[in-house]
């Protein structure tokens, strides 16, 4: 399945340019290999480990017609599932890049640096919208909105539903796919350290909530975080788009800081006051994480990612505002010089920098 338009002049096989242009096709072939494995008895079990959720347990459930339901815990086989859906994320990334963002970049006629920023903001906007809608559906279906106590407890405490586990698997797969995308998108070397920290903080936060079974709390914090990040990405798209909409970006700092404060307040109140509950003697082997170490880990992950992202985005927007201010000042100086050079459409002979008139020689 071709996702990239091939150039008239094909680069050498396995060269850097060849890998960048055809990485979606190659990843599609790898993913198809796991799908075709379902057709054969000898490889179907291995393929199932990559394509479906593992470590399921059937538990009794009152009120259901079957009298039971399947809950999940995490295990080593989850790495295979994360790997497969990481391949899916790479394919979706390439599809959005070619059929949406590349066309938008050509229409706006942006420079190479602005194209990279536009591509990043566009990809993240799609991811945040899909994750936000998906996460809100899960919170509503598991009664987290009507029963806030589920944010720090769940029964049983070492299990999760299918949709909850699949959400976390997909989140981990997306952020892991960001590592090879640094190569495929030709990210500048000076930007790679910041990108690695940004991706690592997300993986630390999501992985911590997944491994500590703080599923509902982690999901709510992600929804708050993604809402603010979506606003930042939309502001970036407007910044590179029509100038008529750039005046509305003045509301961005207020909403951004407010969203970060709400996220920190929810983290501190929920984790600091209610996570431990009445039983403070947790058993990590059984999945009970009501211990001080778990609280410190959750609070540190939440605070660290909020502080880092706030500092990074604030710095970026300050640089943009300074650039716009400098351009505005330079433009105003040019206009003032042009006005001084002419008065009512006639050149002013008294200007200091005007060339002296040549004297006419007598015949």
Curated annotation (Swiss-Prot):
Residues of the TLC domain: 116-324
Keywords in alphabetical order: Endoplasmic reticulum, Membrane, Protein transport, Translocation, Transmembrane, Transmembrane helix, Transport
Compositionally biased spans, kind Basic and acidic residues: 354-363
Location (main, coarse): endoplasmic reticulum
Superkingdom, natural source: Eukaryota
Region (Disordered): 338-363
Topological domain spans for side Cytoplasmic: 1-29, 102-120, 180-191, 242-250, 317-363
Record GO cellular component, one term: endoplasmic reticulum membrane
Similarity comment text for this entry: Belongs to the TRAM family.
Name used for this protein in its record: Translocating chain-associated membrane protein 1-like 1
Organism: Mus musculus (Mouse)
Primary gene name: Tram1l1
């Amino acid at each position: 399945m071709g996702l990239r338009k091939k150039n008239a002049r094909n680069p050498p096989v396995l060269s850097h340019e060849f890998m960048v242009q055809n990485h979606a096709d190659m990843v599609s072939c790898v993913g198809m290999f796991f799908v075709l494995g379902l057709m054969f008895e000898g490889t179907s079990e291995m393929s199932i480990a990559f394509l479906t959720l593992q470590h399921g347990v059937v538990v009794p459930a009152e009120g259901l017609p079957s009298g039971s339901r399947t809950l999940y815990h995490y295990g080593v086989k989850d790495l295979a599932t994360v790997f497969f859906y990481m391949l899916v994320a790479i394919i979706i990334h390439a599809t959005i890049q070619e059929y949406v963002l590349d066309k938008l970049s050509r229409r706006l006629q942006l420079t190479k640096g602005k194209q990279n920023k536009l591509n990043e903001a566009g990809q993240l906007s799609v991811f945040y919208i899909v994750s936000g809608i998906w996460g809100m559906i899960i919170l509503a279906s598991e009664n987290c909105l009507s029963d806030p106590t589920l944010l720090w407890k769940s029964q049983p405490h070492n299990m999760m539903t299918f949709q909850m586990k699949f959400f976390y698997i997909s989140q981990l797969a997306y952020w892991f796919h960001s590592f090879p995308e640094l190569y495929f998108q030709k990210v500048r070397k000076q930007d790679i350290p910041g990108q690695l920290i940004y991706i690592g903080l997300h993986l630390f936060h999501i992985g911590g909530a997944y491994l500590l079974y703080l599923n509902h709390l982690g999901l709510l914090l992600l929804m708050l975080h993604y809402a603010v990040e979506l606003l930042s990405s939309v502001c970036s798209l407007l910044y590179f788009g029509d100038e008529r909409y750039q005046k509305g970006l003045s509301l961005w700092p207020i909403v951004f800081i407010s969203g970060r404060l709400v996220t920190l307040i929810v983290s501190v109140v929920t984790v600091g006051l209610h996570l431990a509950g009445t039983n403070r003697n947790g058993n990590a082997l059984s999945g009970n994480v009501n211990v001080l170490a778990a609280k410190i880990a959750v609070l540190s992950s939440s605070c660290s990612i909020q502080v880092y992202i706030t500092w990074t985005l604030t710095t970026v927007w300050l640089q943009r505002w300074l650039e716009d201010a400098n351009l505005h000042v330079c433009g105003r100086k040019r206009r003032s010089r042009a006005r001084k050079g002419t008065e009512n459409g006639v050149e002013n002979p008294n200007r200091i920098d005007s060339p002296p008139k040549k004297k006419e020689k007598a015949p």
